[in-house]
């Protein structure tokens, strides 16, 4: 690969061809071997049929160039003001297959796309490049290309897709026998590559200049080398091609007028009679019997299938005759077919503003019955005698009006009107219609042949006569003339017709329903005994001539009804079956009113009964229409409606009377085609095939199948929309199902071809035979699935390795037709905790978890518009095409909305496998997915706890209590003591009462003794007191001193004890009051917590309500849409088939038109609602993305964005059609009001400056002490400001800009006045129709009913709110209740029993123990003494059992 180096700046040149580079020289390519066949083969590429045509285009007929240079670098040349560019390979005569070629690059500039043709150096493929066979054409959006580094690797980056790459081969041994080139216009590009033509539909603005990159020695100047020659084409040229019996010849067409006319008007029909692509349709018009279409695209039946095209340069004066049957196609240009000819089209070409000679003097129409009608025009009003002289029908631009008449034998039968100023096409139908420039100028009886004489003179006129047949086609009309035709003759073309576009973009499209055609008639009626009545209606027409010879129906024409026994003019059906028959008689009269002659020639007339005002047609009465009552009358009295009776002549229709109808709807009587009287079940069923049915009065088209269902009630069963689902045969109880003949399917179209289709039934369609299954549908494709895996398995994205070209939701289709699923994006990485630190919460904040639901996507909806509106009815589908692109707009709006939403969702959402593992409670509460450092801790709901062991009090090993035996043996006295006084006293005395006074204790410096004294102490101190009293006189009073001291010490004990008790009581009271305050505060916090919980439940209920609304909105909308199918929109019925079964075609069209209008309105309302909802979801999806990034992945600094409070952290979880966020926020409970300052203005002498706070999150305020402080706005934490907190600004002036609302966009470019914008939209696009009311009904889609859960949450929230009110009352009661507590320390003292108690206990023990031992050892047969005695006696005595006397126990009860 030769490395290309070039730096290029492109400009647009206005000259024809830039030849400023002297390295490019002209080349005579005719000297190249084999070049004589280049033009011939090139021109005949698209002309395969036999015949003669003239083709025009930007063909290579100008100067060829070869560019080379001696330098080793590349250079470029610019061709400007051209419309096509061609290049060819030049090689030396001795070149071989190994000849070396130089790289070539051609860049065609345009906007928004450009074309690049790149050919690598011929020897080796570029490494890593796909097999391009050395050349590639690429469509790119890159306006500039880096030629310096241009390699094949860039193809993947600059080309728009695989559908915009065309590989080709350039081989030096071709020796100039192949031509390569590009021709472009604003609509498409034609690429001539490798003996083939590629048409690329590209709407583009071309700059008409080309940049050519060439290299050194690109001429064939040495052996084994090759070179290129180039040509830019700016002139339009014509070639005349002839293909006769395989012999091809061509010549340059130099007569511009002749060549232009021939190329514009003459073509060679392709096999099948189709007009080739690219034909201009000059002066071809769409035939219409009503108003003329001005512009637009329509699907219609038009005579565009050409059986023979006869190019006629000129006519002689002799008359020419053209017949519909037995036409001889001996002069056809191209193919000729033997199809039935419906319309003969005379296409006229003439020089502008030149009258075409004499034109045709008269058109003679040979109608049925041999009556010849002449059509001719006159330049002035004429008398009756003037009609005997021929007028004319001039072709071209005429000078003055022409008045046209229908003549018979020189008599004017009807005035037609004035001739158009310019006659360009005349078309005549075999059914009697005469069209001029597409408009139905005149209608008569069917026509057999046409004749006229014509001369073109010297006007340069050019004719074509086309024998055509009707076919369905998509016709594009501009200024009333046909511009483009797309035949609906294939599956892909049927989709084009249904979408009203000739160029299908890549995407999914509903498969157009095909016409059912003629099918069997199925009728289901109740068995009954039928009596039949044949009703014969006789109409006697009287025809005569007017003063000018026109046929006139006489007022004496008579209508006769059968007579009944009541002798009235009202005839009523008395049987339960009837059939109507009409007998028409025609008699003529001369100038009197005696009608006794037969109606011949132009007087021939037929009686026809038209629909009139009745909701059914007369000719449909015998088509199993049912009534409760049906009567005919010639008197309008009491009539419900009327039929119009007319006389149809060769020139017009004339009314002769009316038939009045009196009827009641019901099922008692039925109209039948023939007599079926007697006991019959007239039901006729055609099973398992498409049939036109009438089932218990309900009409339609479908497939009837027998089922195994058993239904006890009902005769027929309908859906919500009113469609028939099934019925029951009352004779045997068998239930039959009714299904559509065709089901809706979605076709995948790529590059204008169908590569796959999705359908709900497993049946081949669209010519696709390979299929696979998915969980929701069957997929048929051109991709051969049977070669890859077993048919019928679920498609997986891993089965086929390809890049999808089109996507819809999570489904993608590749260019080869393979189906892939594309919506899952995997992410790697371990799940880590959001936070591992502790969060400190200030006291004036509370934590709240708030729930928020945001919708992220909507379920895509695809609607088959024509199926919804017409339900497959072919006539309705034709009427639907009159609504231009209504269905296409509806379907494309939904499809494009779904594609856009799918692209946004695919780029937004991804799936983490590790996150999926934690999507259950068990996995979330498990330690398997934790980091190893956390696994050793217990896990409860994701929290790692250290256990509850620290909460329990620790055990004290030191023994502080007595045993149970001590409590039994001693009396326990409980008193109150002072600290450790009692314990120290007991330890000192050691239990000796004599040491009582010696062991006196001191408490706060005061001697004290325990207040409790036992008997020994009391006796001791009593004796001391008595001795002191007795010996007091003798000086022995000192004996009572111990008593006095002990008493005083004990009194001290009591006094100090009382003081301590008072202090303790005060301490306890204070502590208890403080405890009550804490309890009050705790209850207040509980109250706040319950209040917050109540608010939290309210937010959860609100979020769930929003989820329910989101999930059910689409189902409700679809339900509304389905219900509209029951609405008849003021038509006589909501069933299209029933309308066509009851009315004639024209009357039924008017009724069906109402249904179409109403249903399209309902569809528009649904689409508008869907698109509005998608716009809302698109905005909420962006909001969800912002919340994930700001709330979940980080901590938001915006107050209220992530919950209503200061954001801590958020969690996100999936919810139906969206995401639900759990925001943990801080809610302030107390506020401090300050006056904030935006800055400080200071002055220093003559200088004034300002200071503003640097950190916008800080607020400057002045406190009550007139000092300035700074505090964060998130929490009140005032601090003294420092100089580093401020930024100095130049001045203190504040500038305000006064502007109006109109001037705001110039200041703020993205400013939008929402209110004014909405008002403008409403004013400019106010509809002139009323959208129907769409009631809410249950639809058979997924319906999420959370009403009960939401009501329960709201009830619980209300209950919690009431609980907070009750707690507030209880808190007030607690605050008003403070109890004064009294409590004394408990001192336990054990007192020993007296000595005589112990003496009594010892005596009892001494007496009772010997007595108990004696009783146990001496009594009973087994007593110890008895046993010893028996043993001793047995050892000394021979009789062992004589001395033994058993002692029996006597038990007395």
UniProtKB/Swiss-Prot annotation:
Annotated spans, Fusion peptide: 1026-1047
Main location: virion
Keyword Mitochondrion: no
Start and end residues of each stretch annotated as S1: 32-780
Motif (KxHxx): 1449-1453
Membrane-spanning parts: 1395-1414
Region (Heptad repeat 1 (HR1)): 1041-1160
Keywords: Coiled coil, Glycoprotein, Host membrane, Host-virus interaction, Membrane, Signal, Transmembrane, Transmembrane helix, Viral attachment to host cell, Viral envelope protein, Virion, Virulence, Virus entry into host cell
Annotated signal peptide: 1-31
Function according to Swiss-Prot or TrEMBL: S1 region attaches the virion to the cell membrane by interacting with host ANPEP/aminopeptidase N, initiating the infection. Binding to the receptor probably induces conformational changes in the S glycoprotein unmasking the fusion peptide of S2 region and activating membranes fusion. S2 region belongs to the class I viral fusion protein. Under the current model, the protein has at least 3 conformational states: pre-fusion native state, pre-hairpin intermediate state, and post-fusion hairpin state.
Family: Belongs to the alphacoronaviruses spike protein family.
Protein name (database record): Spike glycoprotein
Organism, as annotated: Canine coronavirus (strain BGF10)
């Amino acid at each position: 690969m030769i490395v290309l180096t070039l730096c290029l700046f492109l400009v647009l040149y206005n000259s024809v061809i830039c030849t400023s580079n002297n390295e490019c020289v002209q080349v005579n390519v005719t000297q190249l071997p084999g070049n004589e066949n280049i033009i011939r083969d090139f021109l005949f590429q698209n002309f395969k049929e036999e015949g003669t045509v003239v083709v025009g285009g930007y063909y290579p007929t100008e100067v060829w160039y070869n560019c080379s240079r001696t330098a080793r670098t590349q250079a470029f040349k610019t061709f400007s003001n051209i419309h096509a560019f061609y290049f060819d390979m030049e090689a030396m005569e001795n070149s071989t297959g190994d000849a070396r070629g130089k790289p070539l690059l051609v860049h065609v500039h345009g906007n928004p796309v450009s074309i690049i043709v790149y050919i690598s150096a011929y020897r080796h493929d570029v490494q890593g490049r796909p097999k391009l066979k050395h050349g590639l054409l690429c469509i790119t959006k890159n306006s500039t290309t880096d030629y310096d580094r241009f390699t094949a690797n860039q193809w993947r980056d600059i080309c728009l897709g695989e559908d915009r790459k065309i590989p080709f081969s350039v081989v030096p041994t071709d020796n100039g026998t192949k031509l390569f080139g590009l021709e472009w216009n604003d609509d498409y590009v034609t690429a001539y590559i490798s003996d083939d033509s590629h048409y690329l539909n590209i709407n583009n603005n071309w700059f008409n200049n080309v940049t050519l990159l060439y290299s050194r020695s690109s001429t064939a100047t040495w052996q084994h080398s090759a070179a290129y020659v180039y040509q830019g084409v700016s002139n339009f040229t014509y070639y005349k091609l002839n293909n006769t019996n395989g012999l091809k010849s061509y010549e340059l067409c130099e007569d511009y007028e002749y060549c232009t006319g021939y190329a514009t008007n003459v073509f060679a029909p392709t096999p099948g009679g189709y007009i080739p692509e690219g034909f201009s349709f000059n002066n071809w018009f769409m035939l219409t019997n009503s108003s003329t279409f001005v512009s637009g695209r329509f699907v219609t039946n038009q005579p565009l299938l050409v059986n023979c095209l006869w190019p006629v340069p000129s006519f002689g004066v002799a008359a020419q005759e053209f017949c519909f049957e037995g036409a001889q196609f001996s002069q056809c240009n191209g193919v000729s077919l033997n199809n039935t000819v419906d319309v003969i089209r005379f296409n006229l070409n003439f020089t502008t503003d030149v009258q075409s000679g004499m034109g045709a003097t008269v058109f003679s129409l040979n109608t049925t019955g041999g009556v010849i009608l002449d059509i001719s025009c006159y330049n002035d009003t004429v008398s009756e005698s003037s009609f005997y002289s021929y007028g004319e029908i001039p072709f071209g631009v005429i000078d003055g009006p022409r008045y046209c008449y229908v003549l018979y034998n020189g008599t004017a039968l009807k005035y037609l009107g004035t001739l158009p100023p310019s006659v360009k096409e005349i078309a005549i139908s075999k059914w009697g219609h005469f069209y001029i420039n597409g408009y139905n100028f005149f209608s008569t009886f069917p026509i057999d042949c046409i004749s006229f004489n014509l001369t073109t003179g010297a006007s340069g006129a050019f004719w074509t006569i086309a024998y055509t047949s009707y076919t369905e086609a998509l016709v594009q009309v501009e200024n009333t003339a046909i511009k483009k035709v797309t035949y609906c003759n294939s599956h892909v073309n049927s989709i084009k017709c249904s979408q009203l576009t000739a160029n299908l973009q890549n995407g999914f499209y509903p498969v157009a329903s095909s016409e059912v055609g003629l099918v069997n008639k199925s009728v289901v009626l109740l068995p009954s005994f039928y009596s039949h009545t044949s009703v014969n209606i006789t109409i006697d027409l009287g025809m005569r001539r007017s003063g000018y010879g026109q046929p006139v129906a006489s007022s004496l024409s008579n209508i006769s009804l059968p007579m009944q026994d009541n002798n009235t003019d009202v005839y009523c059906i008395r049987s339960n079956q009837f059939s109507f028959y009409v007998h028409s008689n025609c008699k003529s009269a001369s100038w009197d009113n005696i009608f006794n002659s037969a109606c011949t020639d132009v007087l021939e007339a037929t009686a026809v009964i038209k629909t009139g005002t009745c909701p059914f047609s007369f000719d449909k009465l015998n088509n199993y229409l049912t009534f409760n009552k049906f009567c005919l009358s010639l008197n309008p009295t009491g009539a419900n409606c009327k039929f119009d009776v007319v006389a149809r002549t060769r020139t017009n229709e004339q009314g002769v009377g009316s038939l009045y109808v009196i009827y009641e709807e019901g099922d008692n009587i039925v109209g039948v085609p023939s007599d079926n009287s007697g006991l019959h079940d007239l039901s006729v069923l055609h099973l398992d095939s498409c049939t036109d049915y009438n089932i218990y009065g309900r009409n339609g088209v479908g497939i009837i199948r027998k089922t195994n269902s058993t239904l006890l009630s009902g005769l027929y069963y309908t859906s919500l929309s009113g469609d028939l689902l099934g019925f029951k045969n009352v004779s045997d109880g068998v239930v039959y199902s009714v299904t559509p003949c065709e089901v809706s399917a979605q076709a995948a179209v790529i590059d204008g071809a169908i590569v796959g289709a999705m359908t709900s039934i497993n049946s081949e369609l669209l010519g696709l035979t390979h299929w696979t299954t998915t969980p929701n549908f069957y997929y048929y494709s051109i991709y051969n699935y049977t070669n890859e895996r077993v048919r019928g398995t679920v498609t997986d994205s891993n089965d086929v390795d390809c890049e999808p070209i089109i996507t819809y939701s999570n489904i993608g289709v590749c260019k080869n037709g393979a189906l892939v699923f594309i919506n899952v994006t995997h992410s790697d990485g371990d799940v880590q905790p959001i936070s591992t630190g502790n969060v400190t919460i200030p006291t004036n904040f509370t934590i709240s978890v708030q729930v928020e639901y945001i919708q992220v996507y909507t379920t895509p909806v695809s609607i088959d518009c024509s199926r919804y509106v017409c339900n497959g009815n072919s006539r309705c589908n034709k009427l639907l095409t009159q609504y231009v692109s209504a269905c296409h707009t509806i379907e494309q709006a939904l499809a494009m909305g779904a594609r856009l939403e799918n692209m946004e969702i695919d780029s937004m959402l991804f799936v983490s496998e590790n996150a999926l593992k934690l999507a259950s409670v068990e996995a979330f509460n498990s330690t398997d997915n934790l980091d190893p450092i956390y696994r050793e801790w217990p896990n409860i709901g994701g929290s790692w706890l250290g256990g509850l062991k620290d909460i329990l009090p620790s055990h004290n090993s030191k023994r502080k209590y007595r045993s149970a035996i001590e409590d039994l043996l001693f009396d326990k006295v409980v008193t109150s003591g002072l600290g450790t006084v009692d314990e120290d006293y007991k330890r000192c005395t050691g239990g000796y009462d004599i040491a009582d006074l010696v062991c006196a204790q001191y408490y706060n410096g005061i001697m004290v003794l325990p207040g409790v004294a036992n008997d020994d102490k009391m006796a001791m101190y009593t004796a001391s007191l008595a001795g002191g009293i007795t010996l007091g006189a003798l000086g022995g009073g000192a004996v009572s001193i111990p008593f006095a001291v002990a008493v005083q010490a004990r009194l001290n004990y009591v006094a100090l004890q009382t003081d301590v008790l008072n202090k303790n009581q005060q301490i306890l009271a204070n502590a208890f009051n403080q405890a009550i305050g804490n309890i009050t505060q705790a209850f207040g916090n509980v109250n706040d917590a319950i209040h917050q919980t109540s608010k939290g439940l309210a937010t959860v209920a609100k979020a769930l309500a929003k989820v329910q609304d989101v999930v059910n909105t689409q189902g409700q909308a679809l339900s509304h849409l389905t219900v509209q199918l029951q609405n008849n929109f003021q038509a006589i019925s909501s069933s299209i088939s029933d309308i066509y079964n009851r009315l004639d075609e024209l009357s039924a069209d008017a009724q069906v038109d109402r249904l179409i209008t109403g249903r399209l309105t309902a569809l528009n309302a649904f689409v508008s609602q869907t698109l509005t909802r998608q716009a809302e979801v698109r905005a909420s999806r962006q909001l969800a993305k912002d919340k994930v990034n700001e709330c979940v992945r980080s901590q938001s600094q915006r107050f209220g964005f992530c919950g209503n409070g200061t954001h801590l952290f958020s969690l996100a979880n999936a919810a139906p059609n969206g995401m639900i966020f759990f925001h943990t926020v801080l809610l302030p409970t107390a506020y401090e009001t300050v006056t904030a300052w935006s800055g400080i203005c200071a002055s220093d002498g003559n200088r004034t400056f300002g200071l503003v706070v640097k950190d916008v999150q800080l607020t400057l305020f002045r406190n009550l002490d007139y000092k300035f402080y700074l505090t964060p706005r998130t929490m009140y934490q005032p601090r003294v400001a420092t100089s580093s907190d401020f930024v100095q600004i130049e001045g203190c002036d504040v500038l305000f800009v006064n502007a109006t609302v109109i001037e705001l966009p110039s200041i703020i470019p993205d400013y939008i006045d929402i209110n004014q914008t909405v008002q403008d939209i409403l004013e400019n696009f106010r509809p002139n129709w009323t959208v129907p009311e769409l009631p809410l009904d249950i639809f058979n889609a997924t319906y999420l009913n959370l009403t009960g859960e939401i009501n329960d949450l709201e009830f619980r929230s209300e209950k919690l709110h009431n609980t907070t009110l009750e707690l507030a009352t209880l808190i007030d009661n607690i605050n008003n209740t403070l109890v004064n507590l009294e409590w004394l320390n408990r001192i336990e003292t054990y007192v020993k029993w007296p000595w005589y108690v112990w003496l009594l206990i010892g005596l009892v023990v001494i007496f009772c123990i010997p007595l108990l031992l004696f009783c146990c050892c001496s009594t009973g047969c087994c007593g110890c003494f008895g046993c010893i005695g028996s043993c001793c006696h047995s050892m000394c005595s021979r009789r062992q059992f004589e001395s033994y006397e058993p002692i029996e126990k006597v038990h007395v009860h």
